[in-house]
Amino acid sequence: RDSRNIPILSLDSMAVYRGLDILSAKPTDVMQAQVKYLGIDIAEPDQNFSVVDYLNYLLDIDFPKMTYDMDIIAVGGTGLYFSSMIKNYEFRPTDPTIRAELEQLNYGQLMKFHEIYNIELPSVELNKRRLIRNIESSLLQDSKYVFPKLNIPENNVGIFWNNPDYKLNIKKRTSDMIQNGLADELSLLNNPSKTILQAIGMNIDTDIESNINQKSYKLAKKQITWFKKEDSL
């Protein structure tokens, strides 16, 4: 415990949800009693929690003012959360009718949709969710909104730990999650949001431990690459 009791801001898109303590490796009650944690337990599991929701939460707790009054450690997590805090965040609203129609298409059909309507594919690893969002962005390109960057200091310092044993750490964390009752936690979720259903550990029927490990390895590598390219750190 640091004598200055520096608050910790979670950038984890799953830790925002109540009831996902094991899945998101949320700090224990003892840890939360010692240090103030922000960005956790702020949404119900049936809520589709977006980046805009996260930014509105930060404004609700007067986070910009806090950053001038004290040091804050941001940990994790979702690179887009961090980027949206310090830059203008551009987003397009979704159209429920368009989304419902696109969700009926499979991966191959979505790729064909891009080809037929000459929609440029995103330069990221493709999956059904990203293809749908890319089509929506193209169809709704005139409906772009900008969430202004938060008024927070620009002298941010990034700490990157090039841990050669990160895969071993992931394996241990996964094993601990399963032993601590991950399956029971997930079974108790009532009508989980689409955001949660996309999380690592969800919708896995067999060999859950191996699946979580493999997806976590990929995510960890992606996060390291993303944050090292962030020019504000």
Label the model's feature ranges:
Residues 1-233:
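Phosphate/pyrophosphate-binding catalytic cores of soluble transferases and nucleic-acid-acting enzymes
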